Amino acid sequence: MNIKQIQRNKDVINECEDLEYLDKFDSYPVFMGCVNQPIKDDILIDMQWGISKNSGIIQLSSLLPLDVLYSEDHGAGVVGTMWLDHHKEFAKFIQKQSPQSILEIGGSHGILSREYKKMNDIDWTILEPNPVPAADVDAVFIKGFFDDKFIFNGEIDAIVHSH
């Protein structure tokens, strides 16, 4: 598969056009997760890193289009008690801010919303390219990306992103 990468020419922090080539990982797998296909069908890409001479920040200098990077759910935040504990603690932190409505960016399964709503039942919307709602999740899901094309017409007073 021939994928056209997007070249980053500016530092993501200060927008200086001073990225200097640092290193490259050849033939790096695009998808992070379990698959049902043979390894020969994996999508591989050269992962290239650069460093900003001004800020010292190391960052990807070649980017994948979002629809390739997030072509399917990778299960982050779903497996294991450590993730469940993370969502419960993050929900407690959010509650201290007393939001009335939340937009969650990338909440694939909705577990954070479910755990929060056990304490306070509020409007919760999740923007996710590959929604896979867990049991007992009643959040509203919007299939999509948080990019320059995204427009949210609802009312929110908090935006969260859990990982």
Q: Where are each of the predicted segments found?
A:
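N-terminal juxtadomain amphipathic helix
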Residues: 1-82
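Conserved SAM-binding loop
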Residues: 91-163
